Design a protein with these regions (language model features):
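Short beta-strand-loop-alpha-helix junction that forms the active-site gateway
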Residues: 932-990
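Conserved motor-coupling elements within RecA-like helicase/translocase cores
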Residues: 129-130, 563-567, 770-800
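Charged C-terminal transducer/switch regions of large nucleotide-driven machines
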Residues: 117-120, 128-470
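ASCE P-loop NTPase helicase motor core
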Residues: 44-51, 56-59, 67-69, 73-132, ...
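Helicase C-terminal subdomain and adjacent C-terminal extension
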Residues: 632-662, 679, 692, 763, ...
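Conserved helicase/translocase motor-coupling segment
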Residues: 686-764
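A short beta-strand element within the Helicase C-terminal
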Residues: 588-595, 795-807, 811-815, 841-842
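Conserved helicase NTPase catalytic core signature
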Residues: 1-45, 211, 220, 230-249, ...
């Protein structure tokens, strides 16, 4: 119908669009889902696009299992009450499609136009369909659906809780976990246990300035013990100028103290004074000397030689003596008064001798306390200078005391032991570096404390945190605090490990049961539609009844007069292009047509199908197939294919006007070189294969290349086609395979019909010599075959030998005509050759690519050349890597050789790196994997032979029991965006099942 829109020949209509209009899989009602087979995310997107009603093409590379997708598209459409016509050119394709229907249990919904039924058989088939509808029972899935929805919702809530961002902080639980894993990745990373409250977290959203201030505080020893044990700690200094002045004052004090102490020591030695231990004692000593000096202006110095208490009593009044209980005769008083006057210096008149003598007595008592032995006082000549120096020192100390008021040692300098004071001044002088940064340190500390960071500052100081970690400590405190708030906010939605595993396990069981019940649900749905249409299509229902009850049943009449009821009873029809045109009237329409083999079917052959449907979906692989002309008579051997008419495939034509989708998931393994080359050069790098481990029951595909040296060998054929040495070598490989691995199917594919014929004849001849190998070559489902590329498209075997079949000229030059690879469709032949093997592909060739000039090659021969070169380069790399591997197992084991110096692999994800660190902490050696395999975990020796039940597979155990087991791991975080975008079914059941199957 789209082709009919081409009003002007040669003018392309605008390209149509195709979109997935279905709700996300995780939001759908399970009761409405009708998929019969598991589908990966890419295939599910294609199925949903089909259900949305769009026409498009599907590129299906070998190994992507397009028939599974076709069955799912058909079942999903039938679940919507639609009819589906499936057309395939090849009987093998339709047979495989039918086998899938039978396996899923919905074969009764199909009408096979290829089956040769008479009228009664056709009538019986429609009657069986009515009986099927009338007996169909709606499965009781209510409890199952509730469990599926509940567990799915819990897993969705868990992932959303991991990824939902806080409206203010713009972070998620997952990003917080990643950041914390990054912060704590190293052994010397941050370790603070300080937590912030919500207001503090809000205030620290922009914390660059705070981080810079903390780092600066660390640079100026803000978190070093020296900063708090410094004699300047808590000093009151506002700026650098005050710090410099304080330091200069200390230097002055040190000098003044030293000079004064020396002078005081000299004075003490001269006067017989005890050496003062404090400035206060110096003050007392100088004070008594000053007073004595004043007294000696009136009295002689010997007045201090003895006590003058009797003189004091004699010169006192009678009342004083009575008050003090002293009795003294007048004669005695007279004598003592005369004696007292003898101490008075000549010319000095003392008005109150009694009071002056009391002063002398007090001074004498104080003098005695300061001298080491009794002696007459002397007044040093430099007394005034000493007093002035002392006053200056005390004044300077008072200035220092203002600065050091809040220090732990205090500021009582005058009562401080002189040695301690001297030591303190020395300490103050020695700590100049900390002093000069003190104002900035105090200012930063005060500023940060005002921001509410006191607890963090105290913690950083208590742990003596190095400057380079300070910033990370702030980050750890912020992110850990934020994470705890986020966890509280999402409490109930986030699942811990045990609950997550339990919920996933419940979902897997429910989803598996749900998929198992899909056929019953689809049959019940078809039965409901049948019941509804009996009412809505009353006339057609009546005609159907009359036909089934009538004497003669004519299918064409039924399809003409009751097409809706026919499609409702049997909503899935399969046919070849020719059977469709022959058996179905042109008026019979279907909702959707699925065109299988569309890359190898000419457009003209599929026009009857295309014009019968509003929705057209073409599946095929234009890179591995092409249409061939229909030939009635047998061709002459060796005759070239007719080239008069250029055939356009259905796929190629529809691809010019319809959007294209590509099945991306490969369900079988390929050698990495083959997969990389095909993916890059043919499939736009859209293909993806699950990684395969050596522990898998389906080992990774392998590619081996063998070049036959023809030098000095004489071939039985004179031309370059099918050299005898290659035929002989391939025959030997076939016999070797039959003997060594008879459980694996085998085929030989060649690049020319002649070479295929010669190899087949050679194998038949060899078999007569080795009859014991005959069972391997017996006919069967996957019997041994030898075919050329044109007949290999539908063939698949465990092992395939691709024999090029091209030799050299007599002069030894390499041929540039590589048979069918060099032909027009050689690129398709190349893809076919590389994709026929499920397990192992062996290429045998007499021509080495190093002998060829790629500029002289054409079509698939160019691809063949480049593939061989890439294979050789990979082999060379692997040889280099093998030589760089660990010490050979044959060497004696010892701790030195067993030590692994390899760096810890960086997986590009901090949580996964944390996993690696934890594995290593348990003695597991971890090495980097390749491709999707994130890492290889080598178990400790004591665990090397033990299975790992949690992973569902046994470890790969070396034949040498001393070699640790190797477990390949595909790892991802459940908060990764790719993980979150995947449906719960994909990430919880399908992906783990795929990885389990591949080891």
């Amino acid at each position: 119908r789209d082709l009919a829109a081409l009003k002007v020949p040669g003018v392309k209509p605008r390209e149509l669009n195709a979109h997935n209009l279905q709700p996300p899989l995780d939001q759908r009602d399970p009761a409405e889902e009708m998929l019969l087979l598991d589908a990966d995310a890419n295939a599910h997107e294609i199925i949903d696009t089909a259900v949305s009603g769009f026409s498009f093409t599907i590129t299906a590379a070998p190994g992507t299992e397009p028939l599974r997708t076709a069955v799912n598209i058909a079942s999903a459409l039938m679940g919507r009450g639609k009819s589906v016509l499936v057309v395939g050119e090849k009987r093998s394709t339709l047979a495989e499609f039918s086998a899938l229907l039978k396996r899923t249990g919905i074969e009764s919904l199909r009408y096979d136009l290829l089956a040769e039924h008479d009228a009664e058989a056709q009538r019986a088939e429609f009657i069986r369909a009515i009986v099927r509808n009338e007996s169909a029972e709606e499965p009781n899935s209510e409890d199952l659906n509730e469990e599926l929805v509940a567990t799915r919702a819990a897993l969705l809530d868990h992932t959303r809780a991991l990824l939902n961002k806080d409206s203010n902080w713009q972070i998620s639980v997952y990003s917080a976990l990643q950041r914390l894993a990054e912060l704590t990745a190293s052994e010397d990373g941050p370790a603070t246990r300080v937590r912030f409250d919500r207001p503090m977290l809000d205030s620290l959203m922009e914390r660059e300035q705070v981080r810079a201030e903390l780092v600066r505080l660390g640079e100026i020893d803000g978190f070093a013990s020296a900063s708090r044990t410094s004699p300047w700690y808590r000093a009151r200094l506002v700026n650098d100028e005050e710090a410099a002045e304080a330091y200069a004052l200390v230097i002055t004090l040190k000098s003044s103290l030293l000079n004064l102490r020396e002078a005081m020591n000299q004075t003490s030695a001269m006067l017989g004074l005890r050496r003062g231990r404090t400035i206060s004692e110096w003050e007392s000593q100088l004070a008594i000397l000053m007073r004595i000096r004043e007294t000696l202006k009136r009295f002689r110095a010997d007045v201090y030689d003895r006590p003058v208490t009797d003189l004091i009593a004699a010169t006192a009044s009678g009342a004083w003596r009575r008050e003090n209980g002293i009795e003294m005769s007048s004669m005695q008083r007279s004598r003592l008064r005369r004696a007292a006057k003898e101490y008075i210096l000549p010319g000095v008149n003392i008005g109150d001798l009694h009071e002056q003598l009391k002063i002398v007595q007090a001074e004498r008592a104080e003098w005695i306390r300061h001298i080491e032995a009794p002696r007459t006082p002397q007044i040093p000549e430099n007394l005034d200078q000493l007093a002035a120096a002392l006053n200056s020192l005390v004044s300077e100390l008072a200035g220092l005391g203002i600065v050091l008021t809040d220090t732990i040692e205090g500021t009582d300098f005058v009562r401080t032991d002189l040695d301690a004071l001297d030591a303190r001044l020395d300490a103050l002088m020695a700590d100049r570096v900390l002093l000069m940064t003190l104002p900035e340190r105090d200012a930063l500390t005060q500023k940060l404390r005002e921001r509410g960071l006191s607890e963090l500052l105290d913690d950083l100081y208590a742990r003596q945190v190095p400057t380079e970690v300070v910033s990370a400590e702030l980050e750890l405190a912020w992110w850990q605090s934020a994470l705890e708030f986020l966890l509280q906010h999402h409490e109930g939605k986030l699942l811990d490990g045990d609950r997550l595993r339990d919920t996933e396990s419940r979902f897997r069981r429910a989803d598996y049961a749900h998929m198992t019940s899909a056929p019953a649900r689809l049959l019940a749905k078809v039965a409901r539609v049948w019941t509804e249409r009996i009412e809505s299509e009353h006339d057609q229902a009546a005609y159907l009844k009359s036909q089934l009850r009538g004497y003669e049943f004519v299918l064409e009449e039924l399809l003409t007069h009751a097409p809706v009821m026919a499609r409702t009873l049997l909503p899935l029809w399969t046919a070849s292009p020719f059977a469709l045109a022959r058996k179905v009237p042109a008026s019979m329409r279907f909702d959707t047509v699925l065109l299988l083999d569309s890359e190898s079917t000419p457009l003209a052959a599929n026009l009857p199908a295309i014009t019968r449907a509003d929705q057209v979906i073409a599946l095929g692989d234009p890179h591995s197939g092409y249409p061939s002309p229909f030939i009635v008579s047998a061709p002459t051997f060796g005759a070239p294919e007719p080239t008069d008419e250029q055939l356009d495939s259905t796929f190629d034509v529809l691809a010019t006007i319809l959007p294209n989708r590509t099945l991306a998931m490969l369900h079988r393994s390929m050698d990495p070189v083959i997969l990389d080359y095909l993916n890059r050069e043919f499939y736009g790098s859209q293909l993806h294969a699950a990684p395969v481990s050596r522990a898998s029951a389906q080992p990774a595909g392998s590619l081996t290349v063998e070049y036959i040296d023809t030098r000095g060998k004489v071939s039985d054929n004179a031309n370059l086609d099918s050299p005898g040495v290659e035929v002989e070598r391939v025959t030997n490989l076939v016999l070797e395979h039959a003997y060594r691995t008879p459980d694996r199917s085998l085929a030989v594919v060649t690049a020319s019909p002649k070479h295929a014929q010669r190899v087949a004849e050679s194998v038949r001849h060899a078999l007569s010599l080795y009859p014991q190998l005959a069972p391997f070559f017996a006919a069967g489902e996957e019997s041994f075959r030898v075919v050329d590329l044109t007949r290999a498209e539908t063939l698949e075997r465990d092992t395939v030998i691709f024999s090029l079949g091209v030799g050299r000229a007599r002069l030894g030059q390499a041929s540039y005509d590589l048979g069918q690879l060099s032909a027009e469709h050689g690129r398709q032949g190349f893809v076919v050759a590389l994709t026929r093997a499920r397990r192992a592909l062996r290429i045998v060739s007499c021509i080495d690519p190093s002998e060829l000039d790629p500029q002289k090659l054409h079509h698939g021969a160019v691809d063949f050349y480049h593939l061989l070169r890439e294979h050789a380069e990979r082999q060379a790399r692997e040889e280099v890597e093998a030589k760089a591997q660990r010490v050979p197992e044959t060497l004696p084991r010892n701790a030195f050789l067993a030590a692994d110096d390899a760096d810890t692999p960086d997986l590009g994800d901090w949580l996964l790196n944390d996993l690696v660190a934890r594995l290593q902490a348990h003695g597991v050696r971890v090495t980097r994997g390749e491709g999707d395999i994130a890492l290889i975990a080598h178990a400790p020796e004591k665990l090397a032979a033990e299975p790992v039940p949690a992973l569902g597979v046994a470890p790969v155990v070396s034949s040498n029991p001393s070699v640790p087991a190797a477990m390949p791991l595909v790892a991802c975080s459940d908060g990764e965006p790719n993980y979150a975008r995947a449906s719960v079914r994909e990430r919880t059941r399908l992906l783990p099942e795929r990885l389990s199957r591949t080891g």
